[in-house]
From Swiss-Prot:
The lineage of its organism: Bacteria, Pseudomonadati, Pseudomonadota, Alphaproteobacteria, Caulobacterales. InterPro entries: IspD (IPR001228), IspD/F (IPR026596), IspD/TarI (IPR034683), ISPD_synthase_CS (IPR018294), MECDP_synthase (IPR003526), MECDP_synthase_CS (IPR020555), MECDP_synthase_sf (IPR036571), Nucleotide-diphossugar_trans (IPR029044). In the N-terminal section; belongs to the IspD/TarI cytidylyltransferase family. IspD subfamily. Keywords: Isoprene biosynthesis, Lyase, Metal-binding, Multifunctional enzyme, Nucleotidyltransferase, Transferase. This is Bifunctional enzyme IspD/IspF. It comes from Caulobacter vibrioides (strain NA1000 / CB15N).
């Protein structure tokens, strides 16, 4: 089941302390907003509309660099007006229903929460994740003694909250009771049926300065590191240059293959695909397809990186080993590292390129071909 998303990111977040609004702050190396955008795209969102301020629009291209399937619109003076602006900005193409409204200050959206919401809409007009209240509640009016409040039947509402677009538009149009605290309140007032699904303790809202310290810890819980490895080999043939790790090297032979035979890029592509469970390079670029005859292998690697991004993941580091008697790799190693960093969009200090020989043993030792191995670490949503 497909869906679309409106992420409300137009607030000032003053309770979170001085400095940038909380949705633009960096959490475990990435902007708070990016966490939820990546999660929704990885779960299959047809489109994500980010509702922001005029100042925020300047941040978005940098904050969401490399992500496809999102766009922005300007919000209003209140959350309700911003939600309505986001609903108006959604396309009406197939796959845009239902709509999930989400607060940008809740970075840890899980696939399980999203799927539960989609399933609950078959019997409700709006579904939202919620947690049962576990703490004892106290009420203390000004100047009076504290009183215990029963927590029976009380739930803590979270976002995203899911409903059909026309349901939300009609409910907001009919709302006349001031500023609502969430979308469920608006739909409920319009006579809609509300369903609660299992909430997630990780789906905490960043409101106060101390919340960010806890979120830094939770970020490690909400992400997993996956490792992939790849291997490739090509035989030598007549030629005047060889491509290795995206760099052309003058040589008295070339590597023979269907594409440009860049064994370094092929091994690295396979390692990335392996880390995210997406098969191997032959599945995506079959050697039987004439389209890829003589193709530059950097496009294969970029495709693998795009798949990582689409899953809400990020490359941590890569390590490539070239196995050959010649050409000498050391004079070109830094250029290879820089080219790989450029293709992968990661800092060069996260890229390693090494070379070794097999001491004259085997096909590489006899000078019949060159081999490459690669290992990568990829961070993805848990």
């Amino acid at each position: 089941m497909t869906f679309s998303v409106v992420i409300v990111a137009a607030g000032s977040g003053t309770r979170a302390g001085p400095g940038q609004a909380k949705q633009w702050r960096v959490l475990a190396g990435r902007p708070v907003l990016r966490w939820s955008v990546e999660a929704f795209l990885a779960a299959g969102a047809a489109e994500v509309v980010v509702v922001t301020t005029a100042d925020g629009e300047a941040f978005l291209p940098r904050m969401l660099e490399g992500l496809q399937g999102w766009r922005s619109t300007l919000g209003g003076a209140t959350r309700a007006l911003s939600v309505q602006a986001g609903l108006a900005a959604l396309s009406e193409r197939p796959g845009a229903e239902p709509v999930m409204i989400h607060d940008a200050a809740r970075p840890f959206v899980s696939r399980n929460v999203i799927l539960a919401l989609l399933g609950a809409l078959s019997d409700a007009d709006l579904a939202l994740p919620a947690l049962a209240v576990a703490d004892t509640l106290k009420r203390q009016p000004t100047g009076e003694a504290a009183q215990t409040v029963s927590r029976e039947h009380l739930w803590r509402a979270q976002t995203p909250q899911a409903a059909r677009r026309d349901t939300l538009i009609a409910a907001y149009a009919a709302w006349t009771h001031g500023e609502p605290t969430d979308d469920a309140q608006v739909v409920e007032a319009a006579g809609g049926r509300i369903a609660l699904t299992a909430g997630d303790p990780l789906l905490t809202k960043l409101t106060y300065p101390e919340d960010f310290a806890m979120a830094e810890h939770l970020a490690g819980v909400a992400r997993v590191t996956r490792v992939g490895q790849g291997f490739d080999a090509h035989r030598w043939g007549p030629g005047e240059e060889v491509w290795l790790c995206g760099v052309a090297i003058k040589h008295d032979e070339t590597l023979v293959g269907h594409s440009d035979a860049d064994a370094g890029l092929h091994a690295l592509t396979d390692a990335i695909l392996g880390a995210i469970g997406e098969g191997d390079i032959g599945d995506h670029f079959p050697p039987t397809d004439p389209k890829w005859k003589g193709a530059a292998s950097d496009q294969f690697l970029k495709h693998a990186v795009d798949l990582v991004t689409a899953k809400g993941g990020a490359l941590v580091n890569v390590d490539v080993t070239l196995i050959c008697e010649r050409p000498k790799i050391k004079p070109h190693r830094q250029a290879m590292r820089e080219r790989l960093a450029e293709i992968l969009s990661i800092p060069v200090d996260r890229v390693s390129v090494k070379a070794t020989t097999t001491e004259k043993m085997g096909f590489t030792g006899r000078g019949e071909g060159l081999a490459a191995s690669a290992v990568v670490a990829v961070e993805t949503p848990a």
